[in-house]
């Protein structure tokens, strides 16, 4: 998930509750990095962690799990997250939010 999307999720939830009932919100997914099994490079990992810190400085209530980087070997693919959202949507459309 985009770190800015994560940071602004509480605001987005407030916006959703204030929208007219007859307005339909559709979520569209797009992978930013090609689907592959390659581990994320150290440079990319640092770039993303630095971005997380920048987001936290800008939106202080935002929290990220930095243990993720120590406990996992992330892949350089955004399609994995997209497939997870699609799977959640198939189970229940409310889950994709």
Residue ranges and their predicted role:
Residues 1-11:
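Conserved redox-active cysteine motifs that mediate thiol-disulfide chemistry
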Residues 10-97:
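Structural alpha/beta surface segment adjacent to cysteine/selenocysteine redox centers
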């Amino acid at each position: 998930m985009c770190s800015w999307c994560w940071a602004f999720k509480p605001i987005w939830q407030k916006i959703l509750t204030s929208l007219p009932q007859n307005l339909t919100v559709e979520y569209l997914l797009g992978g930013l990095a090609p689907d592959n099994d390659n581990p994320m490079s150290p440079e990319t990992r640092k770039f993303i962690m630095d971005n997380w810190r920048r987001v936290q400085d800008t939106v202080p209530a935002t929290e990220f799990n930095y243990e993720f980087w120590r406990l996992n070997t992330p892949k350089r693919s955004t399609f994995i997250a997209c497939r997870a959202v699609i799977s959640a949507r198939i189970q229940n459309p409310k889950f994709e939010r």
